């Protein structure tokens, strides 16, 4: 009997030991898998051709996006994203350019993100992220008025909402599963990079000259903030929470407008027929931004709303200097115009929703007051964006017959102040990681606004995206 008991005890101990070893082995294997360097990315080919005139090429981009993600320990990780691109068309103007491969075959390398994240830093509820990072704020779809920490990447004007990463320190403190607070410090602000190619002048304001003057030449200089804590720093904080299925946040940013203002124009006569040259000084205004957003779902319908109050720290004044026309005047001859009044904050906001139907179709609708480049209450326009798409053949084929926007710049004279953007699209998933997209975009309207200025750029677009 004792022998049977001892054998039973030994068997139980052996089985328990085996189970523990198996569990330890599984944990070790899982930990090893999590600590492995994860490499992912995509290859993107993006070509566009104009539909008018001689069908000139409008865009040519071949991009490899490479992402590295490694969890070094259970309390830290490294992440980076790098773009290697062949972008644009050769701009060869002389035989000397043929000796420069960067001109014959233009390419660039861009570090989009590169940071280290530490979990449980100093206290178990605090995470810190240091390095170049994309800090995304806001609940709206791509167009977020509260997303103001990172500079806009406006290179492709049709890629709404794209930003560059910033060198920053970001801390997240988690009160519990529902509430957290984020603080961000960016030591030096960066301006937005402007559109390129045929879109280069899309955001440039229309220049109104005094009667009788003809512009012969234009030049400008940029006055960047000094690189010190007082001038170049950007900082912000955001309280985020969830209450009864509603995600919300309140935020504040002490930053700079990423698009410059023309603060001084010097007019110089060049002939007796009214021809002039203009030299402009451009600078970046300091701005306080108070934001709020929310998102929820009701009966399967997604809703979101987002708003930002922009408060200029000082009046933004443009000075036109006509002293060159009056060489005998003992004092400068200037005229000032108020571009932004610090006592009159302005609000940009977005409201929208989306819904997935049982038949595989999807609809997305947004209304936005104030686009990226618009500043001041009297300059904010209204934008309606709509997209409807439907999937077929187990989601391999996606057709979006309705897509685009309707823009109103003056409701009192809407017939002469509107724009229409129509962008139908068809995409096909050839494999699980390869998608081909064909689309066209048409612009029309009257007046003076961003999309009316692109009326001559109706285009056909081809994209191939291969993910790995």
Predicted regions and their residues:
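Repeated loop/turn-to-beta-strand initiation elements of outer-membrane beta-barrel proteins
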Residues: 37, 74-78, 124-128, 178-181, ...
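Outer membrane beta-barrel
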Residues: 69-201, 244, 445
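Residues on the lipid-exposed face of transmembrane beta-strands in outer-membrane beta-barrel proteins
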Residues: 66-70, 113-118, 169-173, 237-241, ...
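Transmembrane beta-strands of outer-membrane beta-barrel pores
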Residues: 45-51, 84-88, 132-136, 185-189, ...
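Transmembrane beta-strand segments of Gram-negative outer membrane beta-barrel proteins
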Residues: 26-52, 76-80, 399
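Outer-membrane beta-barrel "beta-signal"
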Residues: 454-468
